[in-house]
Amino acid sequence: LVVAFAIAALFLPGGTASNAAADGPIVIRYASLAPSSSAFGKILKAWGRTFKQETEGRAELRFYAGGSQGDERDFIRKIRAGQIDAAGITTTGMGMIVRPILVLTAPGLITEMDQLEHVRTELRARFEEMFHDVGFELLTWGDGGKNRLFSANPFARPADLKAGRPWAWKDDPVFASYLGVIGANPVRVGANEVYGGLQTRMIDTVPCSGIMAVAMQWYTKLNYMAKQNFNIIIGGSIVKKEIFDRLTPGDQKILLDTAERSARAMDKIVIRDDTKAYKTLIERGMTEVNLTPYQAEWDAVAKKSREELAGRVYSKSLLDQVTKLAAGK
């Protein structure tokens, strides 16, 4: 999932060590899990240069890349404490700020990018208002690829995961619920602990995208990969509204516009590289698992999980609305 965070992070504003001097530029301190040397990191730097240039030096982004500020949980905590101002986050981080947004990752509901785009376009204003209500500005959306199951052990049906040690992010209620319906016991640790867990066999199954599996090197400890994905890793860039409001209206627009342009450039890379990573993993010997023979069982688990999350993570009415939109209604 780190890749996902990284990806999302690349799309938004950065940060600084000190907020803004009265006679100097407003500096936005931005944390990202994306390594500075990665394609994501390079787009992030380009975005920072463009923002500074278009604001004529009135504001700038200062990036803390490669997880130097911790995990997504740390990002949110530090933003609230005033230690940083912005971050690139994925599913987990977004859900820590606005819980209902996790409806976009409800198991089996949205599995294709065009579905996700349609749903978000229809509900964007509603979600942005949710972020405003808790003191954040959602600068732009960004995604981390198709989320599928990877395992060190053979699997074909949901019950096969019961004997395993599947990982669920400690702040992710969605996949934990999914595993709970199956009857599997998740190992709940942060994303930065997954590789070590795979090495020691404390973890043997992970949900992630192909691009993440490669970028995090998790694939080196895994042997099987589901052909079908069960959702899409969402993400985006957020900034504390207090900092955003210090910008002039013109510079606010520049921040939003440049963030959006960077996000769209990143989307192209994610879609291309996630597909490429999936094919590369198969070429390197990863066994592709076609879930179709037991699709009815997987669908039943996903449906029950979505229903159990309703009322606890998102409302039943929001789930119904997203379900209709995802179906093109």
State where each predicted segment sits:
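Bacterial N-terminal signal peptides
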Residues: 2-14
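N-terminal secretory/targeting leader peptides
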Residues: 4, 19-115, 123, 129-329
